[in-house]
C-alpha cells in the first residue's frame, strides 16, 4: 500500500486499483493503473471494457490488446462436477442412438461451418455489449414468462456489479449461464432451478446472477468462464484477495444433487471467507483506531490553534493599545507644542502695555481658574481680542476659556462670532478704569 501511495495515488485510487486487480486478475499494477486512468477511475466501466476484449470487439480506448480480463478461473483447486447425459438402454435405445448419430454429426458439423463462415461476413452481434443491464433484465423477464415467478432472486445488474457486491459483502456468487438452444436447459429450469428447495437454498446462502449466452452480456461472461456444456453454474468467491471460481457444475443436475454439490463447495471454501472477514474486521478496527487517533489529533490541534489564536489576538490587542497610546501621546505632545508655539506667537504680537499715567488706561485684574491673580493695563480703545490674546499667551491659562465680568455677570465677546463679527473695544464693552474679570476654564466642555 505504501509503495502505491509513493506512485502519487490517493487512498481512494489505491483501493480502486487493488479492487480492479482482484476483479480482472491482471498481475501488472502499471497496466491496471493505465486502464483505470483511461476510464477516469470508474472501476465499473473499466471492468466492462476489459471484459469486452474479445476478438473483433471494439474497445472504448484503442490501446494495445492484452489477454482478456477475467475472474481467476485457473485455480488448480477449483471443484468441477459434470453430469453426463444417460447412456442408451436396451437394444431399441442403442439402435435409435446409432441411427441418429450420423445425422447429429452432420447437423452440428454443418452448423459449425456455417457459423464459422458467417463470422467473416458479419461479426457476431453478441460480441458488442451496448446495454449489459438491459440484457440481464430482458433475460429475467423472459425467464419469468416461461418458467414462472418461483425461482432464486436474480441479481438485476451487470456481471461486474455482481462480482463487486459479492466481494464487498463477502458472499458467494452463483453464476448461471442459460443455453437457450440446449436440449437440457428447459428441463433444468423447470425441474431443478425453480424448485422451492433450490430457490430457498440459493436465496439464503449466496447471490445469484444469470443471463442467456445469446445475450451480449451473457456471451461475454461465457467467453470469460469457458463453459463446455449447458446447463452451466459457476461458484465465485473472494479467495486470496481475488474473485475466484471455486466450483463448476455442468450438465442436467437434479435438485438435491445441486444442493449437495453447492453445500460441498461452500463448506470447502467457507474458511477463506471467514479469514477474509476477520482480516477486514481487523482492517476496519485499525482504520477506526486510526480515525479516532486522527480525530484526537485534530481536537488537540484545534485546541492548540485556538490557544495560539487567543494568544496572538491578545498580543495584537496589546500592540494596538500600545500603538494607540503612543499615537495619542504623540498627538498630545504635538498639540501641546503647537499650543506653546501659538502662545508664544500671540505674546509677540501683543501691543505694549501702556504707561500708568496714560489717560485711557484701564487696569484689569484677572482671577485665573487656579485662583491666582494677574494684573495688566490696557487702553479703552483696544479690542477685547487683545485681552483674550494676552490671557492666551500666559502659561497658566487653559487652552479654552472665556472672560466673565463680576457684576452684572456677562461673558465678554472677545472672539469674532456670527452675531458679533468684530469684537468691541473695552470702552464699548462698558469696562471701567479698574476692572475685575474672571477667567473660566472651558477645556472640559
Swiss-Prot record:
Name recorded for this polypeptide: FAS-associated factor 2-B
PROSITE patterns, sorted: UBX (PS50033)
Pfam families per UniProt: FAF1, UBA_8, UBX
Alphabetical list of InterPro entries matching this protein: FAF1_2-like_UAS (IPR049483), Thioredoxin-like_sf (IPR036249), UAS (IPR006577), UBA-like_sf (IPR009060), UBA_8 (IPR054109), Ubiquitin-like_domsf (IPR029071), UBX_dom (IPR001012), UBX_domain-protein (IPR050730)
GO molecular function terms listed in the Swiss-Prot or TrEMBL record: protein-macromolecule adaptor activity; ubiquitin binding
Gene: faf2-b
UBA domain location: 12-48
Domain UBX: 357-439
Biased segments, Basic and acidic residues type: 303-348
